Amino acid sequence: MNAPTPAPSPVDVIPAPVGLLAELTHRCPLRCPYCSNPLELDRRSAELDTQTWLRVLTEAAGLGVLHVHLSGGEPTARPDIVEITAKCAELGLYSNLITSGVGGALAKLDALYDVGLDHVQLSVQGVDAANAEKIGGLKNAQPQKMQFAARVTELGLPLTLNSVIHRGNIHEVPGFIDLAVKLGAKRLEVAHTQYYGWAYVNRAALMPDKSQVDESIRIVEAARERLKGQLVIDLVVPDYYAKYPKACAGGWGRKLMNVTPQGKVLPCHAAETIPGLEFWYVTDHALGEIWTKSPAFAAYRGTSWMKEPCRSCDRREKDWGGCRCQALALTGDAANTDPACSLSPLHAKMRDLAKEEAAETPPDYIYRSIGTNVQNPLSEKAPL
């Protein structure tokens, strides 16, 4: 009698995706210097049409996706945003609108509510209007955001404020907390900048020093106790000052997928920075086929790709080796240990780099823009 075939390791089983990040467009009225979009932004002419997005959502629901994050760019720049949101409701997908709250966002909010929008995440660049508008690169943005937030809570929609923290606004962390309470937000994300995409280009302008980071953490922890039951505060610390890396996107190809405006499906925001990966498009393949068979998703899924010290580490199924894109940017090899990990031989150098940049006078922001040839000031610097 043949021996039974052993069951595959739980690590090797491909789980159903939980979330879909639908980047409907890269168009955005803001020009934030930490934007996680790629440096080469998709133009409007390359964007997926309405029917393709509706098919993608239908396939996502069939795969078991629960949450759809309608993002961009600015998702309300799409004339079909109401139709797309209605499709989420029809399919039973929880819809989260990730928005700047400016431009045409307010004008479309009531219609989005009427078709079943579930949640709004509003980005706020600063508490002081002048500082916020300097960071976002758009004048008169702050009053629009406040009007938008007020209408969200008037409609009874749950509101999350997202504040990306860096040296230009880290002094405003107490103000972000007060603002979230004032606006009636249910949740506040105090998310220290993650240095990918445009943030990597602007790292020297954005990097705070460790004492500032530590103080911001202390403030958040105190506020969590003070506001328990009133406001949930999520805290994301910067990798450059962390002891262990984050599980990027919950683990490469384990929980989330990201569909770009032109239909390229990514395991994470910055995956396109890794050379040699083969990405599939929703115009050529069904979403389920991409999730289970795409070479890009298979490349760093699970643990078999890992080198030491990750391969034998007891945290390998907790943080999944950290961020592949950051490992590439800082070590030159996407399969190396993320240097955010204290077990990486390059961890101390990463800390030193942050310390050096935080001590320097910050350069001017290089603002996010479509159609501009961006010269990355870090491109000529050797990895760690």
UniProtKB/Swiss-Prot annotation:
Entry superkingdom: Bacteria
InterPro entries, per database record: 4Fe4S-binding_SPASM_dom, Aldolase_TIM, MoaA_NifB_PqqE_Fe-S-bd_CS, PQQ_synth_PqqE_bac, PqqE-like, Radical_SAM_PqqE_MftC-like, rSAM
Enzyme Commission (EC) number: 1.21.98.4
Cofactor entry: [4Fe-4S] cluster
All copies of domain Radical SAM core, residue ranges: 14-230
Residues the entry annotates as binding [4Fe-4S] cluster: 28, 32, 35
A biological process term (GO) from this entry: pyrroloquinoline quinone biosynthetic process
Pathway annotation: Cofactor biosynthesis; pyrroloquinoline quinone biosynthesis
PROSITE patterns: MOAA_NIFB_PQQE (PS01305), RADICAL_SAM (PS51918)
Keywords annotated in UniProt: 4Fe-4S, Iron, Iron-sulfur, Metal-binding, Oxidoreductase, PQQ biosynthesis, S-adenosyl-L-methionine
Catalytic reactions on record: [PQQ precursor protein] + S-adenosyl-L-methionine = E-Y cross-linked-[PQQ precursor protein] + 5'-deoxyadenosine + L-methionine + H(+)
Cofactor: binding details: Binds 1 [4Fe-4S] cluster. The cluster is coordinated with 3 cysteines and an exchangeable S-adenosyl-L-methionine.
Leader sequence residues: none
Subunit structure: Interacts with PqqD. The interaction is necessary for activity of PqqE.
Functional summary from the UniProt entry: Catalyzes the cross-linking of a glutamate residue and a tyrosine residue in the PqqA protein as part of the biosynthesis of pyrroloquinoline quinone (PQQ).
Name of the protein this chain belongs to: PqqA peptide cyclase
Organism name: Methylorubrum extorquens (strain ATCC 14718 / DSM 1338 / JCM 2805 / NCIMB 9133 / AM1) (Methylobacterium extorquens)
Source taxonomy: Bacteria, Pseudomonadati, Pseudomonadota, Alphaproteobacteria, Hyphomicrobiales
